[in-house]
Amino acid sequence: DPQLVARLLASGKNVVTPLNWFYPGKRDVSALEQACEAGNSTLHGTGIHPGGITERFPLMISALSSAITHVRAEEFSDIRTYGAPAVISDIMLFGKTPEEAAASPMVHFLGQGFQQSMEMVAAEMGFAVDAKVISGHEVAVATAPIDSPIGIIEPGLVAAQRFSWQHTVRGVRGIIVMGFESA
């Protein structure tokens, strides 16, 4: 919530968050800048994927290449070892029906950060990306019972998900792709 963050900043509290705000690009951040000035505070957006490795590896590795035609960064995670059952069940919607998972807010929620990652990579590598971001969400269901931190995921219920976002360049897909896959 940008207004809540602005209030915290204006009150003099520094804010460090893994939720967005690591590459504002062309977004209007004047309210946040004013709040930082008023509170003599700072806002630091960071993360691993996105907000860290997603951008830094492609940019770092690009120095070893003479021409870059596309960039793809993906994260894979195994929920069987993820220590946050409420996140797995209530937010990521594992163990739910495919229809329930299709209504997940995760595409939008995660997409805000991944879009910033794509914009940073595009800007630094000189790609002139189109304004539209194409997002995707695929689910796979268990074919056998799977033991997980939320209990057994029964056959027919969501056991894997793939979220993806991509920027097109002059209408061409697959130039800059970011993804998050968990199973």
Describe every region a protein language model picked out.
Residues T17, L43-T46, R72-A73:
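General beta-strand structural signal in soluble alpha/beta enzymes
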Residues A6-N14, L19-T42:
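Rossmann-fold NAD(P)-binding glycine/threonine-rich loop
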Residues R27-D28, E55-R56, V141:
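Short Asp/Glu-rich motifs
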Residues A63-A183:
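Active-site-lining helix/loop region of Rossmann-like oxidoreductase modules
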Residues G52-L64:
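Alpha-helical support elements that line or immediately flank enzyme active sites
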Residues L4-V5, M60:
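Short Gly/Thr/Asp-enriched flexible loops that form oxyanion-binding sites at enzyme active sites
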Residues W21-G25, G47-T54, D78:
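Gly/Ser/Thr-rich loops at beta-strand to alpha-helix junctions
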Residues Q3, R27, A31, I48-G52, ...:
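Conserved active-site and cofactor/substrate-binding residues in soluble primary-metabolism enzymes
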